[in-house]
C-alpha cells in the first residue's frame, strides 16, 4: 500500500517534466524518496521527492546552482532536467504523509556505489585505487568551490562550529539520544564543547572553508571504470574542506585496511589540491565530529539503521571521545602506498 502511494506520487511528480515514463521503480526511502525512471526512448533518470521541510525551495535551487557550476567545470555530477516551463523543481502531494514536497529530476548516472566495492575482503590495491580517486574528486570539488562566487540568492546552511558542535547543531542534539547513559552523555557534552572551541580557533579562511558536498561518503560516489560521479547533493553546505574529506573516510574507519585507505585518500587529495599540515592535523578531529553528528542524524531517522547498528555506532564514537579526552586521537599508520596513476 505504501509503495503504491509513493509510485502514484512519482507519476504525479513526473507530469511537469519533458519525459514520457514507461517504467518507474522505487529505489530508496531515506533522506529523499528516490525512483529510477525509464522513458519510451530507453533513457534513464533519477527522480527525487525531497524530504518535506528539510530545505526551502530557495535552498534547493541553490543546490542546483552549484551542481550546474560543477558540470560546467567538467566535474562528473548528475545532469539536472528542468520542467517543461523551465523550473528546477515541481511540487507534488504525498498523501501518505499528508504533505507536499518538491520533486527534482536528473539523468541517470552510470556506475556502482563505491560502498559496494570496498569491504574487508577487497584487495588492498583496489581500496587504495578507489580512495585515491575519491580524495582527488573531493579536492577537485573543493578547488571549484574555493574559486566560485555564488550569486546573492544562494542560500544554504552552515556546518561551522555552531552547525556541527553548537548547542543546537544542524543534525540535532546528539547527546540527548534516549539510549545514551548519563556518563556517556557527560562525555559527549564535554567533547562537543572542546571541539566547538577547536573549530572556532581553526577559523574560516577561504583556503579551507567554502561550499562543500558534506556527504560524499562511499554510498554517494559512483564508480564507472576510471570515472567517479558525485551524487546526492541534498546536504551541501558552507563548511570546511577537511570535514568534506573526513566524510569520505568516516564509514571505512573500522575496515582492517583503514590505514591504507586513509593514506590513499589523502594522497589523492594532495595530488590535486595543496593542503597545509595544519589542515591535515584537523582530520582526526573532523572524523570524530562526523561520528558525533551522525548520532544525531540517525536519532531523527531511526528507520535507516537497526538498533544494533545504532548501538555499535554510538559505542564507536564514545571510544573516540575517550581517545580525544586522553589526547591520543590520531589516524592509523599505513604501509607505504602503492603508487597509482592519477585518474583525475
Summary of predicted features, one role per range:
Residues 5-13, 146-150, 165-213, 340-341:
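An alpha-helical support segment within catalytic cores of ATP-dependent transferases
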Amino acid at each position: 500500500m505504501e509503495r503504491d502511494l509513493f509510485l502514484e506520487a512519482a507519476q504525479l511528480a513526473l507530469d511537469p517534466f519533458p519525459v514520457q515514463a514507461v517504467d518507474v521503480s522505487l529505489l530508496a526511502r531515506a533522506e529523499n524518496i528516490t525512483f529510477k525512471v525509464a522513458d519510451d526512448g530507453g533513457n534513464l533518470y533519477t527522480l527525487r521527492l525531497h524530504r518535506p521541510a528539510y530545505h526551502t525551495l530557495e535552498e534547493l535551487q541553490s543546490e542546483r546552482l552549484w551542481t550546474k557550476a560543477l558540470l560546467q567545470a567538467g566535474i562528473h555530477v548528475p545532469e539536472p532536467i528542468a520542467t517543461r516551463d523551465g523550473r528546477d523543481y515541481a511540487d507534488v502531494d504525498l498523501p501518505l504523509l499528508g504533505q507536499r514536497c518538491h520533486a527534482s529530476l536528473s539523468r541517470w548516472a552510470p556506475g556502482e556505489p563505491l560502498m559496494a566495492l570496498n569491504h574487508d575482503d577487497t584487495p588492498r590495491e583496489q581500496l587504495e585505487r578507489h580512495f585515491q580517486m575519491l580524495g582527488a574528486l573531493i579536492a577537485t570539488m573543493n578547488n571549484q568551490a574555493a574559486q566560485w562566487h555564488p550569486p546573492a540568492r544562494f542560500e544554504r546552511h552552515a556546518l561551522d562550529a555552531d552547525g556541527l558542535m553548537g548547542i543546537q547543531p544542524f543534525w540535532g542534539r546528539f547527546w540527548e539520544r534516549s539510549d545514551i547513559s548519563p556518563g556517556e552523555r557527560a562525555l559527549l557534552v564535554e567533547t562537543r564543547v572542546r571541539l566547538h572551541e577547536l573549530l572556532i580557533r581553526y577559523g574560516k579562511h577561504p583556503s579551507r572553508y567554502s561550499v562543500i558536498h558534506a556527504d560524499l561518503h562511499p554510498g554517494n560516489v559512483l564508480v564507472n571504470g576510471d570515472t567517479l560521479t558525485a551524487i546526492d547533493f541534498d546536504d551541501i553546505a558552507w563548511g570546511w574542506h577537511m570535514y568534506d574529506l573526513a566524510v569520505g573516510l568516516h564509514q571505512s574507519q573500522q575496515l582492517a585496511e583503514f590505514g591504507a585507505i586513509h593514506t590513499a585518500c589523502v594522497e589523492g587529495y594532495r595530488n590535486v589540491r595543496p593542503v597545509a599540515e595544519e589542515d591535515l592535523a584537523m582530520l582526526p578531529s573532523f572524523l570524530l565530529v562526523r561520528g558525533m553528528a551522525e548520532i544525531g542524524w540517525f536519532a531523527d531517522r531511526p528507520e535507516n539503521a537497526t538498533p544494533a547498528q545504532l548501538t555499535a555506532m554510538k559505542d564507536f564514537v564514545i571510544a573516540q571521545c575517550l581517545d580525544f579526552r586522553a589526547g591520543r586521537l590520531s589516524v592509523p599508520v599505513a604501509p607505504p602506498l602503492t603508487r597509482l596513476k592519477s585518474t583525475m
